[in-house]
């Protein structure tokens, strides 16, 4: 088992991130492309994960396309290749999920999940269907307070924070069509990596 991650926080009061969503809402279409790579060892096998995010934000809507894949020798043992797409609404201080599609190409189930969240309800289809939806499954009230995984990540990076406030903010509320997750981040300070 291996775990790799990166956390970056800017606690400066004049951070440019809050301005991004405000500028988009004011009419400035913005496109961002993120490329991430993480390396770890699983037992003695080097594992590399790559993620690509293409984010386009317009004054009222946004669209995110992403691909996450394990590469190298680890790909022989862990066939993880996920294509993700999310779209929704641009608000002054956040993005809000309307539709999320994930297509897992793992060579086994190759599951496709389609999630739609409205102001009052949500619907989800999975093919093949999930064996269960968690115990207990997420309620409509819980899901309406969430975003899909990639929207939650991008919103976290862009949401405004008051000067001196915890740069990690509150929990990230995430729903992927099956699992409800409240991800609590902890500020570990600035580190030289």
Task: Describe the predicted segments one by one.
Residues 94-99, 121-123:
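A broad structural signal for short, well-ordered beta-strand segments within beta-sheet-rich domains
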Residues 29, 110-193:
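Solvent-exposed helix/loop surface patches that form functional interfaces
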Residues 1-3:
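Sec-dependent N-terminal signal peptides
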Residues 5-93, 100-110:
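N-terminal cleavable signal peptides for secretion/export
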